[in-house]
Amino acid sequence: MSKRIIQLILLSAFARANYVEPFKSNPYIACSEASHCPKEWPCCSQYGQCGSGPLCISGCNPKFSHSPESCVPVPALLPQLEIVASDDKGVYLEMSGQPALVTKFQRKSSAQLLEVHHEEQQYGVSALEQDLNSRGLIHFPDYMITSKPKVAREMLEQYDFIHSGFISVDGKSESLILGMPKKTTGSLISSSKVFLYGRAAVTMKTSRGPGVITAIVFMSSTQDEIDYEFVGSELHTVQTNYYYQGELNHSRMRRHSLPSNSHEEYHIYEVDWDAERIHWMVDGEIVRTLYKRDTWDPVHKIYKYPQTPMMLQISLWPAGTPDAPQGTIEWAGGLIDWENAPDIKAHGQLAAQIQRVAITPYNNDFCPEIHESMGQWGAQNSEEEPFRVAYGYESNNGRFDPKKLKWYTDARLHLSSWHATGIKPTAAQRQQHHRRSLPHVEAPPITNTM
């Protein structure tokens, strides 16, 4: 179901008021294993549409793009290091085991608002977007779109999450609100960096009502996935699942009871993922474990185990809509009652509320080389040029697995316009489009929604 989450939300989340995003193929071009993107629109988005610019950055699928190089390498979130001294080893670096990202979405004291990132955003940003920027979130079409390396470095430093849909901040608690006003496609936030093994903890309240789905997902650009899904009519239950390289095997889903109502009470939902096993945890208690050894496919002679760099995504989306497949509607508990749902009547939208997110990256096979390169970098570069690592792929006979995963310290991670790509990072704007800024939809003002 999580693949459907992304398609439902993000194929249409920006296309409002008859606006067609100039970075998406027009007319629409779908990408799949059977049909890769054309040279003119080379990047296959996570949601199955060909395009350029933003679609080449976050979630760009190298499997179905024109070529793997069409996708920009993705910045990595690495394990935190600490300096250790001992009598036998001397002074050395060691992984601290501390989170590399912790946020309660409060304003950052060091925030530097960037009024304009690129040419298409010539009209600046809204007051809401400025507030979200100061809390470490940036609108999806604007992330890493700039012709200025200095601005790109500031974005990497400032922004923890990319957002789309109806995002706002609770005026009392300052928790982040994922909103879904009447007959819309909901909201999504995605971590701006990826990690290859790690632990993520999300403290949140889910939305409620038949047809309403809240989800916490680890998602890789090659479609490995680990998730939690919450059906809004089953507030004492959570579903867990995983997928390997986009293979839609729904037999792996499991249901688990929750200690209390997921809409009324905050719970901490965690995924603890390493090279050999996955733990799903609720409020510190393990509810499910998957071992890599149990995912062996004797036919293809591979482990069907998630093992590519993941971003963390948290979303709210409508499964119970008249145009959804009947099986999806039944799974979601029926159709959404857009007119009489209590939260629609009281607050103007359905909503999930996120209080805190923490991500702790783990060790992986690349870390020894990365740490060695880090030491060499520090000896040759100034503090103004921080050490950055990004992941990218080369094809392995159509399969994208750790054997073809590459890491870079010198990759260009930004594009100069909405029409640039990983192969042509400084491409100018297409002549058939006029410059304009993408409309940002303001969420209704919400205070103390839950």
Swiss-Prot record:
Subcellular location: Spore wall
Keywords: Glycosidase, Hydrolase, Signal, Sporulation
SUPFAM superfamilies: Concanavalin A-like lectins/glucanases
Domain GH16: 67-347
E.C. numbers: 3.2.-.-
Enzyme kind, highest EC tier: hydrolase
Active site: 225, 229
One GO cellular component, as annotated: ascospore wall
GO biological process, alphabetically ordered: ascospore wall assembly; carbohydrate metabolic process; chitin metabolic process; fungal-type cell wall organization
InterPro entries according to UniProt: ConA-like_dom_sf, GH16, Glycosyl_Hydrlase_16
Chain segments carrying region Disordered: 428-450
Signal peptide residues on this chain, from the entry's feature table: 1-17
Keyword Transport tagged: no
Gene3D superfamilies in UniProt: 2.60.120.200
PROSITE patterns: GH16_2 (PS51762)
Family: Belongs to the glycosyl hydrolase 16 family. CRR1 subfamily.
Protein name: Probable glycosidase CRR1
Source organism: Eremothecium gossypii (strain ATCC 10895 / CBS 109.51 / FGSC 9923 / NRRL Y-1056)
Lineage: Eukaryota, Fungi, Dikarya, Ascomycota, Saccharomycotina
